């Protein structure tokens, strides 16, 4: 190589560039890779610092939002704190406002709290209103503002059919109309007929109408709702019809159920040209009752029993078939019925062998089952008064005179 003028450096000689500096030569692959990793490391480190700053910022925001949330919760609790005004939701205007009716009879255009579930705001729903602004702050459960309650299992009357003397026909008719459709509905389906929807029990006072209804409540597992007709007559307009709706709503929710309305003549008398607001309100209650009885079908398993002393005063629309299909009369007991009632009531009494109940049964006075029970109770009290453990015939005689043989002059005060 020297011959052609090229001198190769020795191995120990250092290669320099044009400036005389040592020449590094091309970088290896490992060196390039380490430089890329270092750059990535720096980028990740800067990103980590940025995320740490963001984390601190988010934590501060979270603490502030939590404080605002707790403050808002306290504000909602303060708004919903009692005492609140109970009202009735009538209509929704938009998502934030609606129309409600108060217990005073006035309607208000109010604001609806944003935390309230709009699905619960249905017409006739019970709501809570703020006492100052009347804003709608809560939706109450259906049973909260209802004066109608259902008898629980331990509250049902302890009256059995065997405790009622006589009335075999009435017992059979009410069991066919009320008990059988609830327990053996397939019998009516096989025959192809519909069971009665409602039953009317009518007759003079003291003939066992309410007692027989209590026996039905005792012997059936269905829910039993008992109300008196006068309970529907309330002070404010619209309260009576709302109570009627509550009764049937409660019965449908707990079906199979039995509704027993005692003294139905308080709200179901024949309609006339009412001149006062009270009479018109009673007629509205009757119309709501008729509407509810038409509104439920046989699949709901709801039966209605009504009792009255004055069937002649009831509105014909209530008595028509389809509403009250079966009408059961409770007349004053005849001689056979008297004997059965006396035997049933005195079965647990300690009677003397000289007592002849047939003597009192044969008397021509028209007495009711309640009168016979009063006679036996008075006879027992006479024995207690004389410190005896046995009831004698004279005790029954005194009891009979005290309850049946009344001088008409004693009732002049009531004439």
Swiss-Prot record:
Family: Belongs to the AAA ATPase family.
Protein task: The 26S proteasome is involved in the ATP-dependent degradation of ubiquitinated proteins. The regulatory (or ATPase) complex confers ATP dependency and substrate specificity to the 26S complex.
Pfam family, one: Prot_ATP_ID_OB_C
Recorded superkingdom: Eukaryota
Location of the protein in the cell: Cytoplasm; Nucleus
One GO cellular component, as annotated: cytoplasm
Gene3D superfamilies in alphabetical order: 1.10.8.60, Nucleic acid-binding proteins, P-loop containing nucleotide triphosphate hydrolases
InterPro entries: 26S_Proteasome_ATPase (IPR050221), AAA+_ATPase (IPR003593), AAA_lid_3 (IPR041569), ATPase_AAA_core (IPR003959), ATPase_AAA_CS (IPR003960), NA-bd_OB-fold (IPR012340), P-loop_NTPase (IPR027417), Prot_ATP_ID_OB_2nd (IPR032501)
Keyword list, A-Z: ATP-binding, Cytoplasm, Nucleotide-binding, Nucleus, Proteasome
Positions with a binding annotation for ATP: 203-210
Protein name: 26S proteasome regulatory subunit 6B
CDD domains: RecA-like_PAN_like (cd19502)
Gene Ontology MF, one: ATP binding
